[in-house]
Regions:
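Class I SAM-dependent methyltransferase SAM-binding "motif I" and its flanking Rossmann-like core
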Residues: 105-169, 211-214, 263
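A contiguous loop/helix-start segment that scaffolds small-molecule binding in enzyme catalytic cores
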Residues: 2-15, 19-23, 94-98, 154, ...
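Class I S-adenosyl-L-methionine
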Residues: 1-129, 219, 234-235
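Short gly/pro/ser/thr-enriched loop/turn and capping motifs at secondary-structure boundaries
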Residues: 56-57, 75-77, 133-137, 206-209
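Residues at the C-termini of beta-strands that transition into short coil/loop
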Residues: 52, 71, 130, 158-161, ...
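Short, polar loop motifs at secondary-structure junctions
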Residues: 51-56, 161, 242-243
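Short hydrophobic/aromatic-enriched beta-strand-loop microsegments
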Residues: 66-72, 123-127, 146-151, 194-201
Length: 267
């Protein structure tokens, strides 16, 4: 695949960029596979902490930026993550726009949770800019969809077994499930998921009308989805123990009927 060098593309600036830390996904390798939003924030960064595996030409957008290589390659000691966390927190007190540039997508096996926890503990504002994860880039190169209507409607992203203390705590994310939420919840509970497993539901992801709710599987299976979401808007359903904290921070799904009514009146 022919790549477009960053030096040949001008990254337009974003208006009103909020000071803080930006965890940006650099994509699977090629510099021109970073998102437009990611490249724009890079162009405005005051300091960038970047992974070892990114295409260094991506840093051409950072003409007047301090660059710090912090990324770990496979097999290096895990304590270096603590050092990265400290660097991000320290930099946020000295610079306006701090970027942590991570290979692939920050949230897919990118150890982003440790960095998020450190930033939240220090009360530092942050934003996550998604990137193309390697599994999708490899599928594109093969010209073979990993999901097909006839053969496979499930995609598993995993690492080597035995690394997680809770291998039974699997995360499931469902596309196009807004009209089958009760069935999804009932099926998962039947398959062994606890009834109090956390669920996050997001409507119109990344759009101005985006809304997020949280509940448990038990609450979800008795909900009336048609009374909670705007007509014909896509909904993503995220299930798993990793979302436990969101039960306290997101709008409760079981109370979303009133919120829905207010939105309907406003529109």
């Amino acid at each position: 695949m022919e790549q477009i060098a960053p030096s040949r593309v001008k990254a337009l600036k974003l208006d009103g960029l909020v000071p803080g830390v930006y965890l940006i996904g650099a994509g699977p390798g090629a510099a021109d596979l970073i998102t437009v939003r990611g490249s724009r924030i890079l162009a405005q960064a005051d300091i960038v902490f970047y992974d070892a595996l990114i295409d260094l030409s991506m840093l051409d957008w950072c003409s007047s930026t301090k660059l710090v290589q912090v990324g770990k390659r496979c097999g290096s000691h895990s304590s270096s993550q603590h050092f990265i966390n400290k660097q991000l927190v320290d930099a946020a007190s000295k610079y306006s726009v701090v970027v942590r540039l991570k290979g692939g997508d920050p949230l897919i096996f990118g150890r982003a949770q440790e960095e998020i926890d450190a930033l939240e503990k220090a009360n530092i504002p942050y934003e996550i800019v998604p990137g193309i994860t390697t599994a999708l880039a490899a599928s594109a190169e093969l010209k073979q969809p990993p999901t097909t209507r006839e053969l496979s409607r499930t995609l598993t992203l995993t690492t080597l077994p035995g690394r997680c203390a809770h291998e039974d705590h699997k995360t499931a994310i469902y596309y196009m499930a807004r009209d089958q939420l009760s069935e999804v919840a009932t099926t998962l509970i039947t398959q062994g998921y606890s009834a109090d497993t956390p669920v996050c539901l997001m409507e119109s992801v990344s759009l101005p009308a985006q809304r997020s709710f949280a509940c448990t599987l038990d609450q979800l299976r008795f909900g009336d989805v048609h009374n909670h979401f705007l007509d014909k808007q896509p909904v993503v359903v995220m299930v798993g123990e990793v979302y436990r904290k969101k039960l306290q921070t997101l709008f409760p799904f079981i109370e979303s009927q009133n919120h829905f009514n207010l939105l309907q009146k406003a529109s």
